[in-house]
Amino acid sequence: MIETVHVNVPGRSYDVIIGPGLLTQGGPRIAPFLSRPRVVIVTEENVAALHLAALKTALADSGISSEALVLPAGEGTKSWPFLEQTVEFLLTQKVERGDIVIAFGGGVIGDLVGFAAATVRRGVRFVQIPTSLLAQVDSSVGGKTGINSPIGKNLIGAFHQPTLVLADTALLGTLTPRDFLSGYGEVVKYGLLGDANFFETLEEEGAAIAAGDMAARVRAVTRSVQMKADIVERDETEQGDRALLNLGHTFCHALEAATGFGDRLLHGEGVSIGCALAFELSARLGLCSQEEPSRVRTHLKAMGMKTDLADIDGDLPDAAALLALMGQDKKVVDGKLRFILARGIGDAFITSDVPADVVLSVLRDGLALR
């Protein structure tokens, strides 16, 4: 049940290996890339408690020594203080360009460690071992790394491709239902942006995926990674098509900023709401029928996911303030917001031609339901 997706970017091609049991194969999978038998691992406390011993054992069985830095869990770790701590740890460990740093965790750890690897000695290699569904299908693939700023999400970072990605789908069984569904928001995004047949498959298999059907999970992760790899190969540094991967994210990042990048709203939950709002905005602009956002919401709700501003606990800014937060998004070009909208499920496109009053109306109507 092991699948491999090859990501072919100039000078930095690598494999994403997907399936159950890969953690115990960590030693032989990583050993061919090492110039000396040692690695440095950066992880977070929850993953460390569950899986760090197994990874270190797998490495030791292949004669590979390892040292680990364990950071706090949560989005707050994706910040300057923990970047500094990570960089200092790598330097203290005398990491060289021929060494491998392992990012062992979810999207926060992958983004943080990838950025640290990009900066230490002007770039050392790193391996992603993503432990969350969100990281397996999205953040571990494609080379985007970085941290958040108080001004906005992911505003500080670099493109730095991994050397290898090991996506052990068995690890998904240790996620809380909320964390798993947060990642599922990114899976659905792929169907919505470019593969109507995949979205239809998710409508049929979503319950099985959530229930732990391993074959269904491997299929969903593999198709998601294939779609991301195809887009990254065409546009590694987000000059064009790669922006399609941000479907739902213009709304999402504003909502994350409004909720303090914390547990009130997980990233994948924001993506889920953002995708629903992007399809609602598309329908109001006459780009697709109202049946499309209704179908999107129906599937997300059936999976127990957030779809509306009313699903976010606590206070939110008004529509104008949310629009201002959207203006801090890194996709702004010449002061204009770029939206990813859709002509239908599986047919997304990029545009800056979106009247602010229509965006405000979507936000106001969503807030009115709270």
Give, region by region, the residue ranges found by the protein language model.
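ATP/NTP phosphate-donor binding region
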Residues: 1-100
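Solvent-exposed alpha-helices and their adjacent loops that cap or buttress functional pockets
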Residues: 8, 33-34, 94-96, 119-121, ...
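Active-site segments that bind and position negatively charged phosphate/pyrophosphate groups
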Residues: 204-320
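A glycine/threonine-rich phosphate-anchoring loop and its flanking beta-alpha core
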Residues: 115-208
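Generic secondary-structure signature for well-ordered alpha-helical cores
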Residues: 60, 92-95, 161-164, 170-177, ...
